[in-house]
Amino acid sequence: MDRTAPVLIRIYKEENTLEVWKQDRNGKFALLNSYPICKFSGNLGPKLMQGDYQAPEGFYDITPGQMNPNSSEYLAFNTGFPNAFDRSLGRTGSFLMVHGGCQSVGCYAMTDYAMEEIYGLVDEAFKGGQEKVQLQAFPFRMTTQNLASHAGDPNMPFWEMLKAGSDAFLTTERPPTVAVCDRRYVFNPVISGNLDPSAPCPLGIDSTPIAGPLRPLQSASASAPPSNSGTIAYPTDDPIAQQISENLRKIY
């Protein structure tokens, strides 16, 4: 893999895991490294409103302007919440970050050590010409078994929609094109032009409604995430990530 090749980030709340995937020379993405999430606030499920202490779930774009090397939490980047899907449902919130440290109010806290490496990988990709990094944030690994274990959860229609995007990525090993119409995500739409997030989907796109109207959380109180499994370790043995991390230490 080239040092400045594009990257993609995947987050799984229930497994307390953030993954960095990197593009190989064939244009496909492969898992580069996994990091334990030190803390996220809230429960499984999307962020709905300012002050609900939920960490977001969904598909987001990170651009160079969202990078913050001067964060009070060491290093950070903004997740991009709310995106077009969130706004179409009236969801509110701001400054939802992936950052260092181990304190979270609606964010994903990764520890300073891990964040140094994650931030460096994203920064190097931008220096290599990547315009935006796709962030895929999930409640858990989107397997049929995991969905079945959460059957009856009111967020299930939303999670089934996220699974469609997750499957699109894992099948092609490339970031899916993400659009929004009819207040729902659509992936790899075979159309030209922009879609109206609040308008019905055009012909040729399945318009079966999936995401329902905005509803309050059953509980807005923060809860501690599940304990780490202990199967994920850092620092990584990957030489690209190690060198980027070392360069960051010299800068910051």
Please give the residue ranges for each predicted region.
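Glycine/serine-rich loop-strand microenvironments at binding/catalytic pocket rims
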Residues: M1, F81-G101, A224-P226, G230-I232, ...
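N-terminal post-signal-peptidase region of extra-cytosolic proteins
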Residues: M1-L8, E19-K22, I37-Q50, E57-T63, ...
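Active-site-adjacent structural elements in enzyme catalytic domains
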Residues: P6, K13-E14
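Acidic helix-start/capping segments at beta-turn-to-alpha-helix junctions
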Residues: E14, P36-G42, L135-T143
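Short loop/turn segments immediately following beta-strands, especially the blade-tip
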Residues: Q23-G27
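Residue-level detector of beta-propeller blades
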Residues: L31-N33
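Exported/periplasmic cell-wall-interacting domains
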Residues: G51-I210
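Proline-rich, low-complexity linker regions of envelope-associated factors in Gram-negative bacteria
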Residues: T177, C181-Y252
